[in-house]
């Protein structure tokens, strides 16, 4: 191993029983997470969102370059602009703009069980939109020149940690990926070497919020894991 600076790494040592209890408790809470499309406008403290993003920013990344940026939108005007641009793309996706849909018949059929359409009122109603950007270049210094590595993998892990932390904080979330979504770079004022990845909507669910029954169908552990 090449010579490099190091620091001690110490974790709390748990008994097997404690480790299992913690893992099962967290798994139980995360299994309650759902994608929410019915949000309340009730405010959420900025500090809660900041803490969740700080957790996401601790994710592992290629060469520790941390190739992500989280643009947090609370401004009603910017939320309105994002909704207008996103719904325009969604109308093209679903074919409700008068032209043939961009999405294939199989894709649209798969979405039918989730009840989605081109209307995205949650983009204005929820108190916070977190627009996640992947940085193709920049390194830790964000100089716009240094190459970043494993960008998609790194940003994906960070997004998962962000969603988990927001759920732990008692917030509902939704991931929205309009396609294309280049308009987000302009609205958020981000540089050209950053690529928008998704919008994470965060807030409290509306009192009458529902989720599709189909969303509760999860693959069993025996199907998603193999032991070799």
Q: What positions do the PLM features span?
A:
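Glycine/small-residue-rich phosphate/adenosyl-binding loop
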Residues: 2, 72-155
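Glycine-rich phosphate/pyrophosphate-binding beta-alpha loops
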Residues: 57-64
């Amino acid at each position: 191993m090449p010579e490099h600076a190091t620091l001690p790494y110490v974790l709390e040592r748990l008994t097997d029983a404690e480790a299992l209890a913690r893992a099962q408790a967290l798994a139980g809470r995360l299994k309650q997470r759902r994608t929410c499309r019915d949000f309340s406008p009730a405010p959420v403290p900025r500090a809660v969102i900041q803490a969740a993003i700080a957790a996401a920013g601790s994710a592992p990344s290629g060469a520790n370059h941390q190739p992500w940026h989280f643009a947090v939108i609370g401004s009603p005007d910017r939320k309105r602009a994002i909704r207008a641009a996103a719904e325009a793309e969604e109308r093209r996706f679903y074919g409700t703009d008068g032209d043939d849909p961009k999405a294939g018949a199989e894709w649209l059929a798969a979405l039918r069980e989730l009840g989605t359409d081109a209307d995205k009122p949650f983009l204005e109603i929820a108190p916070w939109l977190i627009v996640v950007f992947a940085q193709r270049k920049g390194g830790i210094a964000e100089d716009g020149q240094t190459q970043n590595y494993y960008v998609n993998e790194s940003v994906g892990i960070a997004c998962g940690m962000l969603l988990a932390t927001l759920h732990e904080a008692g917030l509902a979330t939704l991931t929205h990926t309009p396609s294309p979504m280049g308009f987000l770079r302009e609205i958020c004022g981000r540089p050209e070497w950053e690529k928008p990845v998704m919008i994470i909507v965060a807030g409290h669910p509306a009192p009458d919020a529902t989720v599709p029954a189909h969303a509760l169908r999860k693959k069993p552990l025996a199907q998603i894991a193999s032991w070799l």
